[in-house]
From Swiss-Prot:
Residues 63-282 form the ABC transporter domain. GO terms for cellular component: plasma membrane. Keywords: ATP-binding, Cell inner membrane, Cell membrane, Membrane, Nucleotide-binding, Translocase, Transport. ATP binds at residues 95-102. It is found in: Cell inner membrane. GO terms for molecular function: ATP binding; ATP hydrolysis activity. Belongs to the ABC transporter superfamily. Aliphatic sulfonates importer (TC 3.A.1.17.2) family. It holds the Pfam family ABC_tran. This is Aliphatic sulfonates import ATP-binding protein SsuB 1. It is a peripheral membrane protein. It catalyses: ATP + H2O + aliphatic sulfonate-[sulfonate-binding protein]Side 1 = ADP + phosphate + aliphatic sulfonateSide 2 + [sulfonate-binding protein]Side 1. Part of the ABC transporter complex SsuABC involved in aliphatic sulfonates import. Responsible for energy coupling to the transport system. It comes from Burkholderia lata (strain ATCC 17760 / DSM 23089 / LMG 22485 / NCIMB 9086 / R18194 / 383). The complex is composed of two ATP-binding proteins (SsuB), two transmembrane proteins (SsuC) and a solute-binding protein (SsuA).
Amino acid sequence: MNATTSAAAYGLLAGADLEAELAQARVADGDARDAAVLERDGSASVVPLARRRPGSPVSDDAVTLSGVSKRFGARTVLDNVELGIARGSFVAIVGRSGCGKSTLLRLVAGLEQPSSGALETRGEGGGELDTRIMYQDARLLPWKTVLQNVMLGLGRGARDQARAVLDEVGLLERANDWPAQLSGGQRQRVALARALVHRPQLLLLDEPLGALDALTRIEMHALIERLWREHRFTALLVTHDVQEAVALGDRILLIEQGRVALDQPVPLDRPRARASAAFAALEDRVLKRVLAGGPGVSDHGAPHEADNVRPVGQIRWAV
């Protein structure tokens, strides 16, 4: 199912830093200079090419976490997290299993509440931030057609809108098919369409491509990136795949033992050239940092405290 907070008007991208980053010159395979910068800056938290320029405006954050901690009983899963997610940006979160990645996503979604600290979400114009989640399991209703799955919660008047979004994900011709007739990648495209038909301001992606084959994952990367640039939503991706994080993110966060251990901007032009020296150097750097850290706390084995979990009745689901 796809969870959402209260709906707010969908607005335009506000993020001068993102536009400036996307305007950087393309990093080509033979650009040894940029690759060397990535290689030699291994001890820094960010690479020089991505640092904020003097006098540049402060980001308009869609999500802000101030001293946020999350505990399940005596176990601390997130510990005093300080984080801002700029509106319109694409942030990828990586880390070992159980480090707190999915817990962070659930907090941002409003599915659970922080044990301490403050988490603020802001929609366009100061309103509420409409949020949708896409999971590894597409969670389609098998007794409804593809079109009906996309239209869930919208009513008959949204048929044209749903068909338009199906066309965007390349599945309009499968509108009357059943989910069982689709491949895994096609089912995830339907799940993506079901989220985007609501025109969310924030799209949360909880390892949505983890069960797909390598070629289908690359195709989905291109689709998600294209739709992100067209729809201008903020995206927060949780993934175990460092290459996926470099391919999609403007910024990569490493969660390690409940804390943000690395905040790495990605100073590469889009679409990302996976074979480039700079791409490979950045991927290698982040991967080495992930492997250097010890195992984190468990996301899955921790008991949930009832007073920290939002009741189901307070969450609006788009299934």
